């Protein structure tokens, strides 16, 4: 397991401010660990492709859990059972009913877009622009995720899929889902703490589009994900060359 403790301007170490329990994620996947201004712990596990796990203290959120993808079998048994499962949209690399069942426990909330719920036959529907309080100091807002390049619009139509912006005691994390650098991003919060942007043309963004989106969002940390064969090193190189000040973290696990 790789563990990183990352402390940015809005993720200050204030251990005396909070006695909340936080169990380290003990998994083979890379984990980044942050502290909120209120002293809570945020852990993010880089599982594979579009699948990540976010733990706020001991409250675990699985995003797009898929057990088998790209010839790999993911070790979800290494994680605690999820308190919440969030699905961005209904494609097979995001929605897998068997994996949802495997990571869930009694009382797990499963939240997804309408087409995913229709396809799965279960789930709590959440649409673009809607917000939910998942737990104390844990909120999520569904934001648009769609294609805009001519000829690609049918892959992810506008108004269907979700990205998710999490507010974790003021620590902002964005998982884009399958999207391009859509105009809506201009209205998203600027300076979010951690942003996951999908980058695998022709389904989501090119490396150039990912750079453009990052320059609009201006996050503290960017993690390109849902990568496929994208040259993720180019994303980092271009942002560094532009003097963006964005800390770009690259993971082969997210191909």
What are these regions (language model features)?
Residues 23-39, 47, 112-171, 249-255:
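Metallo-beta-lactamase
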Residues 25-39, 47, 51-90, 97-101, ...:
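Pre-active-site segment of Zn-dependent metallo-hydrolases
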Residues 148-216:
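Active-site-proximal loop/helix segments of hydrolase catalytic cores
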